[in-house]
């Protein structure tokens, strides 16, 4: 049991280091020369919504479709499992689409301004936005770009807690104009660390399941 706990801690620390690496690459490529904020965040990023099907309709729930909510934000940049699941009928009867892997989610109610990236395809509830690059800006760039922009927004709020994020907040947020070629190059550079983070996140999930199984076995002795 101790060995599993240590392995999980090791993988989490490795992920933290890899995220720091991607942050440093982003800083070097886009922020080092202190570019002026001349355009709106929504000139670069498209905001998309989610929705929840009727909770009392049993045929909509407990299927195979992952359903992201703010509760599913974890220590990892990637979300690979969710507390709730929809059926195909449930997905077809709510205002969320099925978002592809590497879609960035940002929480806009409850705990506001948390980020997660879909590790697999999943739907999403109405307490979040799903973000996609306009004009083919690639997904890993969008994640890191949004991470930087949200951190800037939080700094500007100078410690004040966001109560909610609405579309207008993103429309009003001025950002630097990213060079498309650099964004593509950034995507290529950070694909290896993000792939490793995703692999580690999958391993952590498997280890946690094993840990829980061991715990229940120990407690039933």
Which residue ranges define each predicted feature?
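A short beta-sheet element
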Residues: 69-70, 83-150, 154-157, 161, ...
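Cytochrome P450 core scaffold surrounding the K-helix E-X-X-R motif
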Residues: 77-82
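Short connector loops/turns at beta-strand edges and beta->alpha or beta->beta junctions
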Residues: 73-75
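Non-catalytic DNA-recognition/assembly elements of restriction-modification systems
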Residues: 2-52, 62, 67, 71, ...
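Short beta-alpha junctions and helix-cap segments that line functional grooves
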Residues: 54-56, 117-118
